[in-house]
Design a protein with these regions (language model features):
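Aromatic-lined carbohydrate-recognition surfaces of secreted/lumenal glycan-active proteins
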Residues: 52-62, 118-119, 142-171
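The substrate-binding groove and active-site-proximal loops of carbohydrate-active enzymes
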Residues: 22-36, 86-100, 138-146
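Glycine-rich, aromatic-flanked loop segments that form ligand/cofactor-binding clefts
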Residues: 5-8, 37-82, 118
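Catalytic domains of carbohydrate-active enzymes, especially glycoside hydrolases
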Residues: 1-16, 108-118
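Active-site-adjacent "subsite" loops/lids of carbohydrate-active enzymes
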Residues: 60-111
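Aromatic- and acidic-residue-enriched segments that line the glycan-binding/catalytic groove
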Residues: 18-30, 62-84, 125-139
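Aromatic- and glycine-enriched glycan-recognition loops and surfaces
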Residues: 1, 28-50, 143-153
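A mature extracytoplasmic/lumenal domain signature
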Residues: 10-14, 21-23, 57-59, 121-123, ...
């Protein structure tokens, strides 16, 4: 069978952008590692071969953003940054600033030629230590389901406005 779709890690599990995209905050926080050296050439080759391009963007599991913007991260009740059993910090899915960053990455991927943005880790950490997390006033009375649904709707509107499609991996 012929290849008809390709999923490329654009923002990986470690929080790094793997190719050059126009996302000022990513540059500001140092989350750019351009493993893909010539994205325009890759996109052009895929388009010439009618390959549907999907940009995988890891959402709330983002240790770089959590460390560089600690006010956007999950915190334990003692005020320290929450870390999962692997020692990785996660960002707070209730924070609109986090939504904005993730939507900006997705929009930049669409503008770079991707057909779809696949958001992965669209969820809260499932680590048992999440019981210690204090969300403070960031919840604004919303449930976790409402936070995830809210992000998905927000990102969907932004990606569709940029001319792309969206999918999400939830747990």
């Amino acid at each position: 069978t012929e290849l008809n779709a390709l999923v490329i890690d654009v923002k990986n599990d470690d929080g790094y952008l793997t190719c050059e995209l126009d996302v000022p905050l990513a540059e500001q926080i140092g989350s750019e590692k351009h493993y893909i050296k010539d994205l325009p050439a890759l996109v052009q080759t895929c388009k010439e071969k009618n390959i549907y391009l999907i940009a995988r963007v890891v959402a709330f599991k983002d240790p770089i953003l959590a460390e560089k913007m600690p006010e956007w991260s999950l915190h334990n009740s003692d005020g320290s940054i929450f870390r999962d059993k692997s020692g990785l910090a996660w960002v707070n899915p209730y924070r609109k600033e986090v939504w904005e960053y993730l939507a900006s990455v997705g929009e930049a991927a669409i503008k770079a030629g991707f057909d779809e943005v696949q958001y992965d880790y669209v969820r809260f950490s499932t680590d048992s230590r999440m019981k210690q997390v204090d969300f403070g006033d960031s919840t604004k009375g919303r449930t976790k389901t409402e936070a995830i649904s809210g992000f998905t709707l927000y990102a969907s509107e932004r990606i569709h406005a940029a001319g792309g499609r969206i999918s999400a991996d939830v747990y």
